[in-house]
Amino acid sequence: MALSVEEKAQIVNEYKQAEGDTGSPEVQVALLTANINKLQDHFKANGKDHHSRRGLIRMVNQRRKLLDYLKGKDTTRYSALIGRLGLRR
């Protein structure tokens, strides 16, 4: 269910702020969003997988916290990221 190394590298390259950047809020939120989307597809086929649902909820909460941090820090970067990822906030 996890992202492959190639998928992670592609996401990091797309959302990085500088060379070697893997920890900026934009990269972290993009990686979490990709994982969340994969898990949502998993739950369409496996509706009773409650153990993995707990992990999904944890990822959604972590993404929300990072987005709240970014919104308080720099609203233009926040708005740009929301638009690029297609999140509704």
From Swiss-Prot:
GO biological process, one term: translation
InterPro entries referenced in this protein's UniProt entry, alphabetically: Ribosomal_uS15, Ribosomal_uS15_bac-type, uS15_NS1_RNA-bd_sf
Gene3D superfamilies, per the entry: 6.10.250.3130, S15/NS1, RNA-binding
GO CC annotations on file: cytosolic small ribosomal subunit
Keywords for this protein: Ribonucleoprotein, Ribosomal protein, RNA-binding, rRNA-binding
GO molecular function: rRNA binding; structural constituent of ribosome
Alphabetical list of Pfam families matching this protein: Ribosomal_S15
SUPFAM superfamilies xref list: S15/NS1 RNA-binding domain
UniProt cross-references to PROSITE patterns, sorted A to Z: RIBOSOMAL_S15
Biological function: One of the primary rRNA binding proteins, it binds directly to 16S rRNA where it helps nucleate assembly of the platform of the 30S subunit by binding and bridging several RNA helices of the 16S rRNA. Forms an intersubunit bridge (bridge B4) with the 23S rRNA of the 50S subunit in the ribosome.
Family per similarity comment: Belongs to the universal ribosomal protein uS15 family.
Oligomer status and interactors: Part of the 30S ribosomal subunit. Forms a bridge to the 50S subunit in the 70S ribosome, contacting the 23S rRNA.
The protein's name in its UniProt record: Small ribosomal subunit protein uS15
Natural source organism: Stutzerimonas stutzeri (strain A1501) (Pseudomonas stutzeri)
Organismal lineage: Bacteria, Pseudomonadati, Pseudomonadota, Gammaproteobacteria, Pseudomonadales
Gene that produces this protein: rpsO
